[in-house]
Amino acid sequence: MTVIIASHWGPQSKQMLPPEPPRIILREVPVQNNQKEHPPVQEIKTVSSKSKEHRVSSSRKIPDHFDVGPRFYMNVPADGSEVFEDDEKDVENECWAVIERIGSEDDKFEASELVEYRDHDWYIALAINKEKTPDKANYQHLLYSYRGGIQRIILTPQQTDSIDKTPLVKYKIIGDGLYEVLPIHSSLPQTGLISPKYRYNKGVELRIFGIVNWIDFVLDDDHQTHRTMVWTDAVGPIYLSAADRANIRRKLLLTEMQIFAPLRMCHITVKAEFNFSIPDGSPIQWTISSFQPLIEESEKDPNIGRNLWPARVLRFDDLVVTKKTPNGYWLKSQRLEGHVNVFAGANQIGIIESAGEKYATKGSMMAFVVPCYQNSTFAYFEALIAGPPRVVMIITEGRFLNYCPKTWPPSVRKMRDQYQKEHVLKSEVRSSPICMKQPDYCLKSLRGFSECPF
């Protein structure tokens, strides 16, 4: 339907007559395209005869005394269906409801990571090799996971194509010889986070990023007896003895406090021997051949934690001590009671007791934890560092502030970028000196166009 609102001002004369009320003309708009018929569209057009030429305006407002009967919408189908502007807000509210139900903003990780890394039915595995089965119909994949060790599973060509582009996958046993397998896109080869190399029936070499746990090299007299754990998402924990730390220290010519600072990221190359005689379920002994700590150029360097922080490292802020043993402390979560049990080893005793005996037994603790498995089943979380929140923040030099999820919702991302632009970057902007604006000035003297004598 076409709605034409016309008004007549009378003949052109010196005497101005009062305007007549506009007339509404309704007529059908013919369909222009014969290939595909669309429902008729109702349009609003206003015709004014102030001049000799009639001008059609689609944005003119209809007077209030014509706001009767059904309303007419621009470019709205005649069947009455409407598109609401707040659909995006509804979807966003639903997403936040899911996040609030599964986790909270304080957890500093997104809901997808909660589902992926807290559902312990999944195996997070490194894809080492694949080869066709004797019947040439399926593929046999050689996988290694911290939870299940070496596994040889048979997948269909469709499943093989879905995980063929990433070296890190997750799979779940759904039946006798049946598996559900999914890729982990954050470990794509172009990201550089995981670079595997397989020597057929000889060994595996892997370049990967890891994170170091806490050992007090100054105040702890027993630090030589503690093992340093380097956590990696692909192959789990790699333990270093005091002799291994000393060898790395001699190669890098740095102190152990600089190399193995608490929660310091590192880039390592690990190797392991492998042959076909190793049965399924056997663990692999990894050895570190190259160790490079990522020492921040400035305090709280935001790029390290945002891009390279292992996704399976979780943070809890509501832990309380339940039991003390000669080997360490056991803690549990107040909010997720019965689901989160954390073990802090002997290297964490000093930091947990740093705030006094009363706080050590009744106070809330902060901990960065990684999963620990026994007999291919999840047993508990092991703490990289645990203690009073303020002490943990001081010891880690604020590195936990770098731990932010890989993706925020668009609204939060927009607010963060706007704050960064207005309050952080704006105060750091300084006008460049003249020698930086025009580099040839450094070759000129103030008295004329002459080069420097040297």
UniProtKB/Swiss-Prot annotation:
This is Protein pid-2. The keyword Protease does not apply. Involved in gene silencing mediated by a class of 21 nucleotide PIWI-interacting RNAs (piRNAs) that possess a uracil residue at the 5'-end (also called 21U-RNAs) and that guide the Piwi protein prg-1 to its DNA targets for silencing. Not required for the biogenesis of 21U-RNAs. May also be involved in gene silencing mediated by 22G-siRNAs (a class of 22 nucleotide endogenous small interfering RNAs (siRNAs) that possess a triphosphorylated guanine residue at the 5'-end) and 26G-siRNAs (a class of 26 nucleotide siRNAs that possess a guanine residue at the 5'-end). GO terms for biological process: regulatory ncRNA-mediated gene silencing. Changing G210E: In gg662; disrupts inheritance of small RNA-induced gene silencing. Residues 50-61 have a biased composition (Basic and acidic residues). GO terms for cellular component: perinuclear region of cytoplasm. Its main location: cytoplasm. The gene is pid-2. It comes from the Eukaryota. Expressed throughout the mitotic and meiotic regions of the germline and in oocytes. It comes from Caenorhabditis elegans. Keywords: Cytoplasm, RNA-mediated gene silencing. Changing G387E: In gg663; disrupts inheritance of small RNA-induced gene silencing. May interact with pid-4, pid-5, app-1 and prmt-5.
